[in-house]
Amino acid sequence: MEQAKQGRNETAPETAGYYRGAGCFSLKAAELNELLGVGRCFDMTGRDLSIGGRQARLWVVNGYAQEDLLERVIAGWQALPDLNGVTDAADFCRRYVSACDAAAEPDRDTAVMGVFAGKTLAIIDGFGGGVVLDAKQFPTRSVEEPDTSRVLRGSHDGFVENLMQNAALLRRRVRDTHLRLERLQLPERSGTDVALCYMEGEADEGLLRALREKLMHIQLRSVAMSQETIAEAIAPRQFWNPFPKVRYTERPDVATACIMEGDVVVLVDNSASALLLPTTILRFNEEINDYYFPPLIGTYLQIIRTLVLLLTMFITPLWYLLVKNPDTLHENLRFLLVQDEYYVPLIVQLLLVELIIDILKIASLNTPDVLSNSFSMLGALILGDFAVQARWLVPEVLVYMAFVAVANYAQHSYEMGYATKLCRMLLLVLIWLWDWWGFAAGIVITLTLIVTAKPLVGKGYLYPLIPFDRKKLARLLYRRPVTKKNS
């Protein structure tokens, strides 16, 4: 018995998670069948093989593997006359696996997670550990332009729900030896893969350390909702502050530009959006179309977006404030006052239309394309003549709120759009309560929220305004011509 035990330890050194020795092959296979759910999960396949006269078993998830490639590998294994001279699983991989990436995996739990991630696991009688083949091929949609970030010129591709394809889209654009695509697996039940993409030597090392630390100690059962779940887990906890701490993009060209500027792009498997870090409020004014037009036109578009952002936040509160204080209006501005008689208070009308617009947005997301025309007609009737004739709304409210609703789409970030919306509604309520003092209080609260917003790491939410950086600020305020220094 002692001799047998010594011989077994010489051929298969002890590693955690596996049964050892030839006599334990059936126990090892049975345990892996149990862990992988063979017989209970219709998509999990277990297959018995004979490799060089030895028992072997292979596990793979149907729909994950490249079947032609896997069949060629298996056919080559089964044609082997013997495995004389092969010392362990790592030696087997070096000698007899050339069609795809393969590695010996001594840890059982890691091997099982690999199968769930699309890899193929094989165990061979007499070898410690298992052979893990990377022959996966995930089902995915084709690369196409995102619906929400279209451009008139430039590339018309977008990220998909496959991490490897998204990484390839970045690598295709950045052919630089300093580009790093660092892959991490989150420590939660779903084992989601995440990639940190950055330029070595240019990205903030403090940001990278903070990201790795937070991602590898993330306390979640799963990342079912993908990038938003991760964003909430890594961002500072300020649930009361509506201003976004993370930017998103579905465009590889935007992500590439951020990487080249020293930012960090976080790709999440099963997500077609990338996270852009660090985030400052002035970065939300940038838009990809600015850089597909000449500098003068790009600068004009940036100015327009800045004005629209300010108008969407302040136009209805200022109008409501002036209507409440008609004596402050010059005679030439009296047309701003409400001309028709109304029964519903203006504050109720304004807040009601704010809510109705959001209801229509939510409904439009769930409306089939076939019914979209009918939905548009119904929405126009609700916020059109019927509402005015029924004395629910006055025409002035509809005009200003229609402008706000349309102008809000000039902001490409949904999160920033809703942050300005919440601040606008807060201003309306404070003006209703305290008039001019309420307006002043609303401005102070809004500025306080912006100043106290905490990015994950970096120089602050108001950078490059505070701390002041003239070159960075100038770049964000207007579109500079491309030169050797700033290209």
Language-model-detected regions and their locations in the chain:
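Membrane-embedded alpha-helical signal segments
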Residues: M1-L318, L322, P326-E331, F335-L337, ...
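Short glycine-/small-residue-rich flexible loop motifs, especially phosphate/cofactor-binding loops
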Residues: N33, R171, T256, I357, ...
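Long alpha-helical, hydrophobic tracts
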Residues: S142, S155-G158, R175-H178, E182, ...
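Transmembrane alpha-helical segments that form the functional core of multipass membrane systems
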Residues: V266, S273, T279-H412, M416-L427
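Hydrophobic alpha-helical transmembrane segments of membrane transport and translocation systems
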Residues: P395-V397, M401-S487
